[in-house]
């Protein structure tokens, strides 16, 4: 790893290096507990300002809807600087569970030996994680201790989502798709496992002790089902705001427990939410509104069926 020689290296651990910069201490707001990086919807890097109480609230919410107990043994494959990876740790420590951590890659044999020997009971991944599992013939593996698979970090192709949902249904395991943002201390919604197949693609409902809603372009709350609007979230796990420069660390809570997610969604008759795309990610061609996110989803679905993929490549 390249190191700026202008700074003194204090220590190096697990690939991370702590440097002594000599910079003056930075004044911070008393409610600020920690910072996590995020790129947000625009891709511009910034830090999310968490306050004291965010993690505790999120831990309670997550452990409740997953039904976590001290007997759980989750296997952590996501980095701790990533909000969902961190949520795996704090939600399980909240109930006194053991978190299994390894630096082995999912493609290494040692990873699976560790998983079996340590009797891992759950696995949390992003769509890419499950694409790897699919290529590794995960469905043929004998993993009797594994009872829960959870997914977040983006929308999975429908066919892959269904494949894991059906596998879990047929093998006495639970498949729970979740939705969240760094700004909401990770998980903000989840799809109950009984809906994993019938409502595949939905993010489900708000986590316990929180609330989802939809608003129109005027900011009015949408009550009717199957009507698109911007999805909003209210809960104690909502963070304070962003930090783009040192001075921002002095800022107070700019959200007060409420945030507009920037996602365009609708709610069905059962109260389950479906995300259509990001606000603003639309083109207007010949008077018709075309969602870029929906186009990406269609292409992803096509690429998961060989015949359709051949047709797509031939276009």
Report the location of each language-model feature.
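Positively charged, low-complexity/disordered segments
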Residues: 308-310, 314-315
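Structural core segment of the AMP-binding/adenylate-forming
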Residues: 1-28
């Amino acid at each position: 790893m390249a190191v700026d020689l202008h700074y003194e290296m204090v220590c190096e651990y697990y690939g991370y290096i702590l440097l002594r910069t000599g910079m003056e201490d930075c004044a911070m707001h008393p409610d600020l507990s920690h910072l996590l990086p995020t790129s947000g919807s625009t891709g511009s890097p910034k830090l999310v300002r968490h306050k004291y109480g965010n993690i505790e609230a999120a831990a309670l919410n997550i452990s409740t809807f997953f039904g976590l107990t001290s007997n759980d043994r989750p296997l952590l494959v996501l980095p701790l600087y990533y909000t969902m990876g961190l949520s795996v740790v704090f939600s399980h420590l909240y109930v006194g569970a053991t978190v299994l951590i390894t630096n082995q890659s999912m493609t290494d044999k040692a990873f699976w030996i560790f998983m079996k020997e340590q009797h891992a009971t759950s696995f949390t991944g992003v769509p890419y994680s499950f694409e790897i599992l699919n290529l590794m013939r995960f469905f043929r593996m004998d993993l009797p201790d594994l009872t829960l698979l959870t997914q977040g970090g983006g929308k999975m192709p429908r066919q892959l989502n269904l494949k894991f949902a059906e596998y879990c249904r047929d093998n006495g395991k639970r498949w729970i798709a979740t939705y969240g943002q760094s700004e909401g201390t990770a998980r903000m919604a989840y799809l109950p496992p009984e809906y994993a197949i019938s409502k595949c693609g939905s993010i489900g409902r708000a986590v316990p002790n929180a609330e989802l809603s939809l608003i129109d372009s005027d900011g009015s709350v949408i009550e009717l089902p199957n009507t698109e609007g911007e999805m909003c979230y209210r809960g104690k796990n909502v963070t304070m705001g962003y930090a783009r420069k040192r001075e921002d660390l002095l800022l107070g809570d700019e959200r007060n427990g409420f945030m507009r997610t920037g996602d365009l969604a609708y709610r069905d008759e059962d109260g389950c939410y479906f995300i259509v795309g990001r606000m603003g990610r639309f083109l207007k061609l010949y008077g018709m509104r075309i969602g870029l996110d929906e186009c990406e989803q269609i292409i992803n679905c096509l690429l998961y069926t060989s015949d359709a993929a051949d047709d797509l490549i031939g276009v």
